[in-house]
Every structure is written in structure tokens, then in C-alpha cells.
Amino acid sequence: MLAIEVKNLTKNFNGLKAVNSISFKVKEGEIFGLLGPNGAGKTTTVKILTTLLKPTKGKANVWGYDILTQRDEVRNSIGIVFQEPALDNRLTGYENLDFHARLYGLNKTKREERIKEVLNLVELQDKAKVLVKNYSGGMQRRLEIARGLMHYPKVLFLDEPTLGLDTQTRRHIWDYILKLNQKEGTTIILTTHYMEEADFLCQRTAIIDFGKIIVNDTPFNLKNILGGDVLSIEAEPVKEAFSVFQEFPWVKKVSRHNGFIDLNVEQGEKKIPLLMKIDQKEKGFEIKSVNLRKPTLEDVFLHFTGKTIREREASQSEKNKMVMQRRFKR
């Protein structure tokens, strides 16, 4: 069964296409990722699928229900963890969950049973009676996930669930997400701009940029598009080194970002000695360091867009600023 089916979904905001005719499907029980920079259209897509925004064009079904004509059925089938905190800091963890469950009409017996289940799932059972204002950022995020599960949703939307958390806490949240998917069988739609998060959690990932889905596949298959190895080289001057590396027949692709030059090659360990044989003085550059690694989703993003996700975030911000300036000049 398909948990979500999206066809040619579009959303315009005053001349700006936040979502541009995207289509994708999510299978029941799957963790599906929308991966892209800030401003790419991820959150707008989630808001449309959760009936918080109406699309300009296109169709979508969530758990078999039309997002436009069956909004109540959609809302009863989903849970949402928003990017911005939505807990009441004046209540305890237990009280936050109890309040949410009451909104969905769970009786007292069912509420108490479910609160115990979800608190155990995110390992907050010992903090149930503590005021949320005394929770750490990671604990609050775990409680928000627990709250999103209170009414037994078929589909759970997680919008940037680890944004602003430190690396260790982020990895703990990943473990809880995997556990709830495996233990409860919940279908999860995850938005993120963290490449390693999508790689670790998602069975399939759609890379979205400027409102369009660029490519959609498993993280393994996406990285396999590039194949082989990546030699990440620090060299000075970059321009001269880049020109020389482009001439090598054994280099499949050359790209540069953040002061480094990346070479996509086969059997990278055998290519490092070839690099070291270059007469660097004659060619007019110096190799400072060489790092051998496998392709990442960052490399995939760079391959399809020509920029890293951080560079794209900067250009998206500049584009939005220009649109706003033109609007105010009218």
C-alpha cells in the first residue's frame, strides 16, 4: 500500500515557486527523506501534505485520503513534529502528552496506556512529571516525537527533527526514530538538510532544490551513481591544479568547493601515487593534502546541482532577498 502519493504538486507565493510540480510516492512502513538546503521547499511540502497549506496546483493522497476533499481523515491519520518547538513549557511531559491525547478523543484508560508506551519508546519515563522548561533540547525533541505518536498515526511527519542539536544528541534522536519505525511500523516522512541524517535513516531519499525534486532513490543507489572513490585534494593555487586534474583520462569528474578539489575516480588508492608523480613545480601548483573516501550524499547533491548544500543555501537566501526587493519596488 502507498502511504503517500504526490502528483505534480505546486505552491506559489507571490511569484515565488516554493514547490515546483513535484511527484513522489511513499510506501507503507517506509522512512522517506526530503533532503535539501533551507528554502528548497521541504517544509512547504510538509505543510501541504498535512493540510496546513493548500497547493496552487497538483494532487496528493495521504493514507488514501485526498488532502483537499478529505482533510479531517488526513489529519486523523497523521502525526506532526514541527520544526519550531510546540510544547507548553509550563506543563510536565506527562501533561503535554495527556492534553494532546484529549484533543484526539482518547479515553482516560487509553490515554494512560499510550502515554506510558510512548514515554518508554523515547526513554523519558523517568522525566514524565518534570516541567518541560527543565528539559534539555534533546529531551524536548524526544517528547515532541512521543506527542506526535499519541493517537497512533499511520504517517508521522518530522520536519528537521534534529535541527540545532549537538552531534551526540542528534544521533540519539536517530536511534529513537529507527526504533519507532521498527517497533510501531510507522511510516515516516523526514525533512532534513543534514546529508548524514538522510543517509543513516532513510530507505529512500528525494533531493529537492529550488522547489524541484532533482533525483529520488535509495541512498545507496544515489551514491552509486557516482561510483568508485573520491579523492579530496587541497592544492594551491586551486585554479592551476583544477586545470591539470581535468586533463587526466582516469578522472571521471572534477569539482571544487570550499577550497578543495574533488576527483571522482575508480580504485582511488591506486591513483594517489599518480598524483604524487606530477611535477607540481612545473605545473605551477602544490598539493597540500589528499584524502581518499567513498562518495557521500553531499557529492550526489554537488553532482546534480553544481554546488554544495551550504553554497545552495546561501544562493537561495540571496534569490529570496532579490524577489522581496523587486516586490517592494512595485
What annotation goes with each model-predicted range?
Residues D98, R102, T109-K127:
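Conserved ABC ATPase "signature" region
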Residues L131-Y135:
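Conserved ABC ATPase signature
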Residues Y152:
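Conserved catalytic motifs of ABC-family nucleotide-binding domains
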Residues L156-D159:
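Catalytic Walker B motif of ABC-type/P-loop ATPase nucleotide-binding domains
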Residues D175-E266:
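ABC transporter nucleotide-binding domain
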Residues V230-T308:
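Short, charged/small-residue-rich alpha-helical element at the C-terminal edge
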